[in-house]
Swiss-Prot record:
The protein's name: Large ribosomal subunit protein bL28
Gene from which this protein is expressed: rpmB
GO annotations of cellular component type: cytosolic large ribosomal subunit
Key word Transmembrane helix present: no
Keyword Isomerase: no
Gene Ontology BP, a term: translation
Bias-annotated ranges (Basic residues): 13-25
The entry's keywords: Ribonucleoprotein, Ribosomal protein
InterPro entries in alphabetical order: Ribosomal_bL28, Ribosomal_bL28/bL31-like_sf, Ribosomal_bL28_bact-type, Ribosomal_bL28_sf
Taxonomic path: Bacteria, Pseudomonadati, Pseudomonadota, Betaproteobacteria, Nitrosomonadales
Organism: Nitrosomonas eutropha (strain DSM 101675 / C91 / Nm57)
Length: 78
């Protein structure tokens, strides 16, 4: 399973570890993914989403129904 947020689309980024001596080695910055279950009142069922902490705050702000409607408009299957 890919490390991608289902709501925001955030993916791993690449960058450098930088030591005190300014030596650089490649590394990956991974998104803060969480697996959460949400109750969809309109469909009377649970859905499971793999999303970032930023997406959780978006759901708190806008509501799960609005976020799911946006995902479906993008063509994602829920």
């Amino acid at each position: 399973m890919a490390r991608v947020c289902q709501v925001t689309g955030k993916r791993p980024m690449s960058g450098h570890h930088v030591s005190h001596a300014n030596n650089k080695t490649k590394r990956r910055f991974l998104p803060n993914l969480q697996s959460r279950r949400f109750w969809l009142e309109s469909e009377n069922r649970w859905i499971r989403l793999r999303l970032t902490n930023a997406a959780l705050r978006t759901i708190d702000k806008n509501g799960i129904d609005v976020v799911i409607a946006d995902m479906r408009a993008r063509g994602e299957r829920i």
